[in-house]
Amino acid sequence: MAMGNPELRTHFFRSSHEPGIPNSLRFPNGFLVTCGLPWLLLLFSVTIILFHPLRKKSDLPLINPGKGRIGILRGYRSRKTFTTELPRLVADGLSKASAFRIAAPDGVNIVLAPSYAHEIAEHPDLNPGPIAGDEFNSHINGFEVFAQLGTSDVISESVRTRLTRQLTKLTPLLTSETPLLLQSQWKDAPDWVEVSPHETALFILSRLSSLVFVGDDLGRNPDWIRILTSYNTEAFAAAEELNLWPQILRPLIARLKPSCRQLRRYIRDARALLVPVLEQRRHAQSQGDRREYNDAIEWLDETSRSTGQPYDPILSQMLLAIGSFHTSSDLLGQVLLDLCMRPDWKVLVRELRKEIISSLQGEGWDKIALNNLKLMDSVLKESQRLKPASTVTMGRYASREITLSDGTIIPKGSTVFIANVAMRDSNIYPDPDDFVPDRFTTRREKGDSSAYLVSASPEHLGFGLGRHACPGRFFAANELKIVLSHMLMKYDIKLPDNGAVAPSKSGIFLATNPDARICVRRRKEEIVI
């Protein structure tokens, strides 16, 4: 369950009322919809033109100021370039300064070079909580799942402590479920079949994570899986569309857009499925049932009671799904493509199979076996290095004005990111654009403690850095190794004739291309795993 870099926080039953239209703007007999809406949009637009141009908040250079004299048009063009051209903007910015500004949908953000990563990660006045809320408009109904970020520590503490402590107990569940899920997707055909690595990864990992998060009954419910995977995918797209509008108009636009209305339905449907499970467990406990549940429903509740912090069980589960489904499936899908794109892919897959067989010859799937998958660990980390989840990372909100060690000033209220470029730095990684499967295995042999998949360092920010690094990365690493082992032992893989497909880019996100395909063929595995 790779949580990406957003640290999972939550709040109990946060009010999710839609922002209402002030009484002064209400019209009788449906006038607002039929006649008043165009004038209301015009009024808001004029307000923005007059009072909301892109303003300087610091002396740092602004890379995408936009063109034109009208503030609203200039702001739209800046937001558009952020969405479509962020990698180029970051490269342009770093060629001019180690600290610069970029106009984004949620305002003008500060981007810093990787050399600032440690300082930003440990600064007490830089908090990741508000970032996702702004980016995903968490104050708007339908996006309130993201409001769980930054309001309490219930989710992050549940993942960091309770989930991590249960890794050994969860391994049998993952290893027994994975072959069933994989067979349902790739079948047993002896001939080559074309499949989507993205869809396969999402299908398997969403179901494995759901079993861990909500238990056996609801975790196997196809409606629950559909709701969470659909919300996971569509919330990002809806937020991107909404962010092209000025902030002042977004609550109104969200009321009208079908995609935003659909998000609200997903939340209602998820609540309708999970609430009966919660009530059933509470009723059973009140009747003396002492059954112990090893899932996130219980971990969240235990953490809330031990810390005294409230949370919303439904929104918390949806946020866990976003953190788990999205980043883990993206990495697994990309690894499959990277393996197939290697000129010597047959040799590499053969070496990985040898390592799997050797690792499982002892006690089977245990902690030692997972730790012995060193080449696989390196392959996963190398794939994440070449195609991280985002162009910028470690988003932080400045709660007061901050002066960094080199004199750079971060104004109060600023959003700060680290440019995710160190992983392509030739001074750190020789041949940085090449996929080198054993790159991190070699580093581990030389005593580099940062060369493990789960290690976070300024040179590899795949899981963030410092106290806000992804708390679920240890579970994610185990889950990915188990699933990839079953894939490689049970199937041959290769690229189709039309070859590789580049990752897709949108805003800060870099994703495995959903149109990419690989070919798979059932093989006879050397050992039963």
UniProtKB/Swiss-Prot annotation:
Instruction: Return one GO MF term.
Output: heme binding
**Gene Ontology, cellular component aspect:** membrane
Q: Which Gene Ontology BP terms does the record give?
A: austinol biosynthetic process; dehydroaustinol biosynthetic process; terpenoid biosynthetic process
Q: How does it sit in the membrane?
A: Single-pass membrane protein
Where are its TM segments located?
A: 31-51
Q: List the InterPro entries hit by this protein, alphabetically.
A: Cyt_P450, Cyt_P450_CS, Cyt_P450_E_grp-IV, Cyt_P450_sf
* This enzyme's EC code(s): 1.-.-.-
The compartments listed are: Membrane
- Chief location of this protein within or outside the cell: membrane
Quick one: which residues bind heme? 470
Q: What happens when the gene is disrupted?
A: Impairs the synthesis of austinol and dehydroaustinol and accumulates the intermediate compound austinolide.
Q: Which residues does UniProt assign to the signal peptide?
A: none
CDD domains from the UniProt entry: CYP503A1-like
Q: Which SUPFAM superfamilies match?
A: Cytochrome P450
Could you list this entry's UniProt keywords, alphabetically sorted: Heme, Iron, Membrane, Metal-binding, Monooxygenase, Oxidoreductase, Transmembrane, Transmembrane helix
* Co-factor(s): heme
Give the protein's biological function: Cytochrome P450 monooxygenase; part of the gene cluster B that mediates the biosynthesis of austinol and dehydroaustinol, two fungal meroterpenoids. The first step of the pathway is the synthesis of 3,5-dimethylorsellinic acid by the polyketide synthase ausA. 3,5-dimethylorsellinic acid is then prenylated by the polyprenyl transferase ausN. Further epoxidation by the FAD-dependent monooxygenase ausM and cyclization by the probable terpene cyclase ausL lead to the formation of protoaustinoid A.
Task: Spell out the note in the miscellaneous section.
Answer: In A.calidoustus, the austinoid gene cluster lies on a contiguous DNA region, while clusters from E.nidulans and P.brasilianum are split in their respective genomes. Genetic rearrangements provoked variability among the clusters and E.nidulans produces the least number of austionoid derivatives with the end products austinol and dehydroaustinol, while P.brasilianum can produce until acetoxydehydroaustin, and A.calidoustus produces the highest number of identified derivatives.
Protein name from the UniProt record: Cytochrome P450 monooxygenase ausG
